[in-house]
Amino acid sequence: MIKTILVVCIGNICRSPMAQALLRQALPGVSVISAGIGALSGYPADPSAVEVMAQHGIDISEHRAQQLTGSLVNRADLILVMGGAQKREIQARHPSKTGSVFRLGEMEQFDIDDPYRKQMMAFEDALAMIQRGVDAWVPRIRALG
């Protein structure tokens, strides 16, 4: 049974907060948290991420970045990352969690590009890819319990 999902990106201000919000919406009984491998703790979500999510009726304006820690990793039943490099880094740092770390795009074999400091179109593209990943994961997570 998956009780806690940890979503990870680099800064925890663009992709992972968007994925966290979508997963929370789709899986109300599951605790979904997010963190960044290189996050500046306390920073708000990127204004473009807030805007693109608001266009889809989801408010992430209260999000604050947090640094990925061993405690967060150990607490998670499933860790979803945006790309292969993040997956490898977490697996190397936390070998006991290797079997719990997957890309959000694992099923369709895609990574989600970082839209940070890019045009709004990059955020829209990232959100579309995140939604594809969430849509692929949600039935599998529900099937586990």
Curated annotation (Swiss-Prot):
Coiled-coil intervals, chain numbering: none
MF GO annotations: protein tyrosine phosphatase activity
InterPro entries from the UniProt entry: LMW_PTPase, Ptyr_pPase, Ptyr_pPase_sf, Tyr_phospatase_low_mol_wt
One GO BP: lipopolysaccharide biosynthetic process
Sorted UniProt keywords: Hydrolase, Lipopolysaccharide biosynthesis, Protein phosphatase
Active site: 9, 15, 114
EC number in record: 3.1.3.48
Enzyme class: hydrolase
Involved pathway(s): Glycan metabolism; exopolysaccharide biosynthesis
Catalysed reaction, written as an equation: O-phospho-L-tyrosyl-[protein] + H2O = L-tyrosyl-[protein] + phosphate
Family: Belongs to the low molecular weight phosphotyrosine protein phosphatase family.
Function as written in the Swiss-Prot or TrEMBL entry: May be involved in assembly or function of the EPS I polymerization/export complex and/or the EpsB ATPase. Alternatively it may function in the removal of the terminal phosphate from C55-isoprenyl pyrophosphate in order to recycle the C55-isoprenyl phosphate lipid carrier used in the synthesis of polysaccharide repeat units.
Protein name as catalogued: Probable low molecular weight protein-tyrosine-phosphatase EpsP
Organism: Ralstonia solanacearum (Pseudomonas solanacearum)
Organism taxonomic ancestry: Bacteria, Pseudomonadati, Pseudomonadota, Betaproteobacteria, Burkholderiales
